[in-house]
Amino acid sequence: MYLIKQLLLLFLRLMLWLSSILFVSSPAMAEDELSGSLPEFSMGETLSFSKQPLYKTGLKEWGSLNVRGVATGLFLNQSNPITGNDFSYTNFTNAQLIIENNEGPIRVFAQTGLYDVPVLGLSFTRTRDNTERSYGYLPQAYISIVPENHWSLMVGKLPAIGGAEPTFTYQNSNIQRGLLWAQTNSVSRGVQLNFVDGSLSASLSLNDGAYSNVYNWIGGAVGLKATEKSTYMMSWTGSVSANASNSYVTPLLQNNSQISNLIYKYSGDYWTLMPYLQYTYIPQRPTVGIKGSSGTVGSAILATYHITPLTDGVAPARHLSIATRVEYESSYGNSLANAAPNGVLYGPGSSAWSISITPTLQVDNFFARTEIAYVKAFNMQSGSGFGSGGTMNNQARVVIEIGLLY
């Protein structure tokens, strides 16, 4: 444990040095305190769980055990459906129970049930197929050991380091995940060491990347809270050796990649803004069929306007908001991998942009929202785009999601 602490502190010093170069900061940053610990199950700005969980019981010195419920469904209509997709779907997107104990020296988190993860620019998969082909009926489950206020150690199926968007629909201000999200990991099995001290938070992780069951990924993240409303975040995570795994949940190229992010977030009572940059790199690894190097460069801004404003960051019982996401991503290089001929986007050297607009209404436990989204690709490889033959360069979607959060 001493060696791990020293490595984490060394990492923090490096990230602080980088922060002094990349950001204009003030001495006040060291005096502000983060509200709570590192986020383990984050939620967006437009939806929130009820204050009272579905079920709660006391565990004496171990704190209380909370049980929360999620039930959501959607209607999706799209133009130029990808081969194998229909023009429209009606589907349950989440039927989950979340069990957590966030007090005491030993804490647990378990998320169980069905889930769908619609992604811009990718084929739509129904909920049961997505659940069984990805992380199973227990997508996240871990134990967190908290020996003191500053340190914690998480072990199990963890939310992955990297990227700016969580995985599940109700965790986000937009219904669908974005172009940049598709290059990152969602759930990884492994261990993660967390540190929090005032305005500084950090984590280090050893994990299996894109759920490959090969523990050859390391990652680190740091957050600096500049003011009560502004936070800077940086992360790096990546594969340190070749891995031949290639499946629905473990794509060959993404599972051999390295991911870097720079994120800024402003949280106000009327506006939430989060611009971020993302860079991915896939090194040449001939032993697993990756004969060349490639990667992506992307940028995005996520903005939410709270028509009914928050009060000190807390949403009212009747909350009306509009979330918008605009992003651009380009690919470079060519991995020359027979198992992934289209590369990481729509072919080597391709690029794409997207926009999503999501008006949302939440009243107590119930919410309803609609989303209009559009993706356009450029310089795409023949057969890698939209439509039955993969020859169309754009796709529009209209999505409606309703649900209950307890």
Question: Where are the language model's segments positioned?
Answer:
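Outer membrane beta-barrel
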Residues: L54-G219, G223-K229, T311-A315, A323, ...
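Intrinsically disordered, low-complexity segments enriched in Ser/Pro/Gly/Ala and basic residues
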Residues: L18-S19, V24-S25, I143, S293, ...
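Short gly/pro/ser/thr-enriched loop/turn and capping motifs at secondary-structure boundaries
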Residues: I161-G162, V240-A242
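Extracytoplasmic/secreted cell-surface and envelope-processing proteins
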Residues: N213-Y215, N243, Q284-R285
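Outer-membrane beta-barrel pore domains
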Residues: E33-F41, P81-N85, T127-S134, Y232-W236, ...
